[in-house]
């Protein structure tokens, strides 16, 4: 019996082992089959053929990329990262039930992530980054409860982040960056209390960050940059004191940062908040974050000063505060430089595009010797470049452009031998260009344009063999162009325009095969244009106008990339080459004011009369009809003729004599006309239309505008200005209602007014700026120059029409006047337009002529600022041009609206616009014009309103409307202060007026009902009552 039991036990044990072995073999077969199915949908783009080992000749646990467990010999790791595999991820991968690590990163897998990945309940590490995956993130991943790392970054995944991921309680790293994810930030992710890294950057997510994020107390790295998140700075983040890296850049966050920011997040090493809408001041408590290494809050709306406490951040190596409103134009705006000199690790400092004023301090030379990038451009910095600037021996990028720097470059500047980029343009730096620039052999960009440099161009620049950009235009350089600079093989752009250079243009230019743009216009160059220029095969822009070049146009037929060419105002002769019509990219061609002869082509660019200018060439003919050139005479073939009689010979001689005399008179008249024309052009300083007008894709002809305005009929005349008349017209096949401003070119400065409007509208667009539809630069029916600008028509006329009682009959709806709320809306529109021009344009613009007649209203009474004929691009400012080109009724100001400093020769500025806006605001809400006869001497609209308000208290008004009007007038007073430094900024004015509107003018009755339906005191009545009460 005992023996029988032992036999049975052994038999059962053996049977169990056989079953286990069979089960293991079956499971192993399942893993192998899953791997082979995965391989079947994959191909390789490399020579290694790593999957070649995946076959039956060897155990699958020995296959490349496969790791098995020792006990069960099941696949626990599939690591194929970086093998350059293509194809799709097979759903069979979900059968590897013992898998703990799955790494398919850095391949080219496409299609979607299989839902069956959710079967891998033992999975701890999942990395499918840097592939071509698309579709949704599978919600089934929530079944993989042991996951600690999920990296799906750098794919094309879309839709939202699955809220189910919030159940992965062990997740430490979640990286979904660089995809196409949309939707909101899931509140359920607040359950991931083990999360240390979250990266959602480079997606399209939106909404606010939920408060549940505050529970992520283990978080070290939080990055959601380059999305569309909004709201204030997420309050939840203030609770995560463990944060070391925080990036919210390139979103739409707004509001102020808390003053105790640095106390709440003391462990930060990286803080990136750039390109949002944050306002207020930079928290001084940031100095408490002693570990801070990189801080960037560029491109926001911050104001105030740059904290001196930054000097305590000894680990700081990157400080970016570019493009804000810091400094307030104060002379103390640069004091922080002395403080950050204590940041001995500093490598990058960018405070450009702010309002930093005062002289450039000598302490700049005490900045860290590790500093490689220094950006102070686009501010209001004056003084000279300090003599010890050469101490910054590691400097690679130096940006001081568009300030008010003067004096000569110091000798020590030549010690900066590591410089690669030098931006000094648009200052008042003088002296000769130092030869030591030739020792900076790493230079790539040298921008010295728009200064007061004189003397010769140094030959030593030829040693800068890596130079890409060489900008020296708009200085006082003389002498010849050194051939050495035209032997720099890397040159892409060279601009020597607007100087006093003489001699021939060197033939060495033909060696610049990479040259894209060449400008040598408005110099004193002579001789023939270099024939070798035809070898610059990459050329797109060629400007040689305003010189004394003669002879024929060189052969540029191989320059197939040419877009803009200007050879005007020279002495070029011969025929216009036909191959110009065959250049496929040519969009603008100016050959005017030369001595060309013969037939003008009619194909290619010559088909468009508005893209080609040939006026001032007296011996040309043909061309398209719109050019209005004389027809070409076809010469008859010679034939045998009978001898003339004596009488016929006498008659013929007399006719020939008379014809010769007439010809002499005509030629003399044309020469006089050309000379006068050239003189007028020179006095106007007219640059090439082709470059400025290149932004308008479709220009209209004179004939089209002539027809659209019924031959510029007086019945269509809707306004007159300093430089011309404005007509109403119906343009194009759709009869679009437009306003056509025709310039009177006989009036001095009119051409510059035309160019100023074109230049200003290049690249700007705002709902409160009048829309410039197109332009016309052509000849009229009599062959005279014709310039016109075509705007969107504003049916409600100008604000001036509404403000003047004598013009009310011209308003469409003359039975009513503007309500206080409507006036406030208009004021906000104007202020918003100015804020855009002053702050948000790439090149800030000063309008220089804000007044009621330049504020146009559409059907909804939305205001549009118009008439940019006097506008100044502040970063291209030319003081002499400002002082001389316009009359006192021009840019120096319309009397009553112009800033006081303009009357003393001050330069155009955004502060001048603020003054004009303040006067406009006072006029709108006081009922008095700034030119009222009661004003004399120092007693003006500003002082009048100020004296009225000083006699009333904040509760002096009879109702909320009156209180609102009082606050509006206070804004007008702050904007129209005598001294620019005391005036309110446009962005402050916008915020203040919006706040007043929301508090005092937000009711439905106030905004929408007319005075007949909802009686209320007008601003004029309120001022009158207050005046009588207080005077």
Swiss-Prot record:
Transmembrane segments: 654-674
Domain Protein kinase: 712-1001
Biased composition (Polar residues): 1005-1020
One GO term of the biological process aspect: regulation of anion channel activity
Disruption phenotype: Enhanced susceptibility to R.radiobacter.
Cytoplasmic side: 675-1031
GO cellular component, one term: endomembrane system
Residues involved in ATP binding: 718-726, 741
Effect in UniProt of substituting residue 939 to F: No effect on elf18-triggered immunity
Highest taxon, organism lineage: Eukaryota
Name this polypeptide is given: LRR receptor-like serine/threonine-protein kinase EFR
Native organism: Arabidopsis thaliana
High-level lineage: Eukaryota, Viridiplantae, Streptophyta, Embryophyta, Tracheophyta
């Amino acid at each position: 019996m005992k023996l029988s039991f032992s036999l049975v036990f052994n038999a059962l044990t053996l049977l169990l082992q056989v079953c286990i072995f069979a089960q293991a073999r079956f499971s192993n077969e399942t893993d192998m089959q899953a791997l082979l199915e995965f391989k079947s949908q994959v191909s390789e783009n490399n020579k290694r053929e790593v999957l070649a080992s995946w076959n039956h000749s060897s155990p699958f646990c020995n296959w490349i990329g496969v790791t098995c467990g020792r006990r069960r010999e099941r696949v626990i790791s599939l690591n194929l990262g970086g093998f350059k595999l293509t194809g799709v991820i097979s759903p069979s991968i979900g059968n590897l039930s013992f898998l703990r690590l799955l790494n398919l990163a850095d391949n080219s897998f496409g299609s979607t992530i299989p839902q069956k990945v959710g079967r891998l309940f033992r999975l701890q590490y999942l990395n499918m980054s840097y592939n071509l995956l698309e579709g949704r993130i599978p919600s089934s991943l929530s079944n993989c409860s042991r996951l600690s790392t999920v990296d799906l970054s750098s794919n094309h995944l879309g839709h939202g982040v699955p809220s189910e991921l919030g159940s992965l309680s062990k997740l430490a790293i979640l990286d979904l960056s660089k995809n196409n994810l949309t939707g909101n930030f899931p509140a359920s992710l607040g359950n991931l209390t083990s999360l240390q890294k979250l990266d959602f950057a480079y997606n399209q997510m939106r909404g606010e960050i939920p408060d549940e994020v505050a529970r992520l107390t283990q978080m070290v790295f939080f990055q959601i940059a380059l999305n569309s998140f909004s709201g204030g700075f997420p309050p939840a983040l203030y609770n995560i004191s463990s944060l070391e890296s925080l990036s919210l850049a390139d979103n739409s966050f707004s509001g102020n940062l808390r003053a105790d920011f640095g106390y709440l997040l003391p462990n930060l090493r990286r803080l990136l908040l750039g390109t949002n809408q944050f306002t207020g001041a930079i928290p001084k408590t940031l100095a408490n974050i002693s570990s801070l290494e990189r801080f960037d809050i560029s491109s926001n709306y911050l104001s105030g000063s740059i904290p001196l406490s930054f000097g305590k951040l000894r680990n700081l190596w990157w400080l970016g505060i570019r493009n804000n409103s810091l400094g307030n134009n104060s002379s103390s705006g640069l004091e922080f430089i002395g403080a950050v000199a204590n940041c001995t690790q500093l490598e990058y400092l960018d405070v450009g595009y702010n309002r930093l004023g005062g002289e450039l301090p000598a302490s700049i030379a005490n900045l860290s010797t590790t500093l490689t990038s220094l950006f102070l451009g686009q501010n209001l910095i004056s003084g000279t470049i300090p003599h010890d600037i050469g101490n910054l021996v590691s400097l690679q990028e130096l940006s001081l452009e568009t300030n008010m720097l003067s004096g000569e470059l110091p000798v020590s500047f030549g010690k900066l031998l590591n410089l690669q980029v030098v931006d000094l343009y648009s200052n008042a730096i003088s002296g000769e260009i130092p030869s030591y620039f030739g020792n900076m052999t790493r230079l790539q960009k040298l921008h010295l344009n728009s200064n007061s440099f004189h003397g010769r161009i140094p030959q030593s620049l030829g040693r800068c063999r890596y130079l890409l950009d060489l900008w020296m235009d708009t200085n006082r350089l003389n002498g010849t162009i050194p051939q050495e600079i035209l032997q720099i093989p890397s040159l892409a752009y060279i601009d020597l325009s607007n100087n006093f250079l003489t001699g021939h243009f060197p033939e060495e230019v033909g060696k610049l095969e990479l040259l894209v743009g060449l400008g040598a216009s408005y110099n004193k160059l002579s001789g023939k244009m270099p024939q070798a220029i035809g070898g610059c095969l990459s050329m797109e822009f060629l400007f040689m106008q305003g010189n004394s070049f003669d002879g024929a146009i060189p052969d540029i037929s191989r320059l197939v990339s040419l877009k803009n060419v200007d050879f005007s105002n020279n002495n070029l002769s011969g025929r216009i080459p036909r191959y110009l019509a065959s250049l496929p990219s040519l969009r603008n061609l100016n050959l005017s004011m030369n001595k060309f002869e013969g037939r003008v082509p009619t194909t290619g660019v010559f088909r468009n009369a508005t893209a080609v200018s040939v006026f001032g060439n007296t011996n040309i003919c043909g061309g398209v009809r719109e050019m209005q050139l004389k027809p070409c005479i076809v010469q008859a073939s010679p034939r045998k003729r009978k001898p003339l009689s004596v009488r016929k010979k006498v008659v013929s001689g007399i006719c020939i004599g008379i014809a010769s005399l007439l010809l002499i008179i005509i030629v003399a008249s044309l020469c006089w006309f050309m000379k006068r024309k050239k003189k007028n052009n020179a006095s106007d300083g007219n640059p090439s239309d082709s470059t400025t007008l290149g932004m308008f894709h479709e220009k209209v002809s004179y004939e089209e505008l002539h027809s659209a305005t019924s031959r510029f009929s007086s019945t269509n005349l809707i306004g007159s200005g300093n430089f011309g008349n404005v007509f109403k017209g119906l343009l194009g096949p759709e009869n679009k209602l437009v306003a056509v401003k025709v310039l009177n070119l006989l009036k001095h400065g009119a051409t510059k007014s035309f160019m100023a409007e074109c230049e200003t509208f290049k690249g700007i667009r705002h709902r409160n700026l009048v829309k410039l539809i197109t332009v016309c630069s052509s000849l009229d029916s009599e062959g005279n120059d014709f310039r016109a600008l075509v705007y969107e028509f504003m049916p409600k006329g100008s604000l001036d029409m509404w403000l003047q009682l004598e013009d009310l009959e011209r308003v469409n709806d003359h039975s009513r006047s503007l309500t206080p709320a409507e006036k406030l809306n208009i004021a906000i529109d104007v202020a918003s337009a100015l804020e855009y021009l002053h702050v948000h344009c790439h090149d800030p613009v000063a309008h220089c002529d804000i007044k009621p007649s330049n504020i146009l209203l559409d059907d909804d009474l939305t205001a549009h600022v118009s008439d940019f004929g006097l506008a100044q691009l502040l970063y291209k400012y030319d003081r002499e041009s400002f002082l001389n080109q316009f009359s006192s009724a021009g840019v120096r100001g319309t009397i009553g609206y112009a800033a006081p400093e303009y009357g003393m020769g001050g330069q155009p500025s955004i502060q001048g616009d603020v003054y004009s806006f303040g006067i406009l605001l006072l006029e709108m809400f006081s009922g008095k014009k700034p030119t009222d006869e009661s004003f004399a001497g120092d007693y003006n609209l500003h002082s009048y309103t100020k004296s009225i308000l000083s006699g009333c208290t904040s509760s002096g008004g009879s109702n909320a409307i009156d209180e609102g009007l009082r606050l509006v007038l206070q804004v007008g007073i702050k904007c129209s202060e005598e001294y620019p430094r005391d005036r309110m900024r446009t962005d402050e004015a916008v915020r203040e007026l919006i706040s007043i509107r929301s508090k005092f003018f937000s009711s439905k009755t106030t905004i929408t009902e007319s005075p007949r339906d909802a009686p209320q005191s007008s601003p004029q009545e309120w001022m009158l009552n207050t005046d009588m009460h207080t005077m």
